[in-house]
Amino acid sequence: MLKTTLLFFVTALCEIIGCFLPWLWIKRGASVWWLLPAVASLALFVWLLTLHPAASGRVYAAYGGVYVCTALLWLRVVDGVRLTVYDWCGALIALCGMLIIVVGWGRT
């Protein structure tokens, strides 16, 4: 379970970085060269999703819970925005959904 969650976390970071770098280029006028590591990060994201031993749809559904929490962590650390009680509640609900799916995929 911990290995799966850690893999989901690293996968989410790759996806977020792969989307954040083009955002910097478009919104903040960063160098177009930031698109190269963005592409590499998104390619790594896709590859990491293939490392899970469950059906792809189930992996994507479970991954979503960790993605939500990782995005909120990004919001706090990178964007400097304080999380609200709604953010925390949403993260808890998303993680509960992920947990139910991951525990269940070992039993089917």
UniProtKB/Swiss-Prot annotation:
Transmembrane regions: 6-26, 31-51, 61-81, 85-105
Compartments where located: Cell inner membrane
Periplasmic side: 1-5, 52-60, 106-108
UniProt entry keywords in alphabetical sequence: Cell inner membrane, Cell membrane, Membrane, Transmembrane, Transmembrane helix
InterPro entries, A to Z: UPF0060
SUPFAM superfamilies in the record: Multidrug resistance efflux transporter EmrE (SSF103481)
Lipid bilayer topology: Multi-pass membrane protein
Keyword Membrane: yes
Main location per the UniProt record: membrane
CC annotations in GO: plasma membrane
Topology, Cytoplasmic side: 27-30, 82-84
NCBIfam families for the chain: PRK02237.1 (NF002586)
Family in the record: Belongs to the UPF0060 family.
PANTHER family, alphabetized: UPF0060 MEMBRANE PROTEIN YNFA (PTHR36116:SF1)
Protein name: UPF0060 membrane protein YnfA
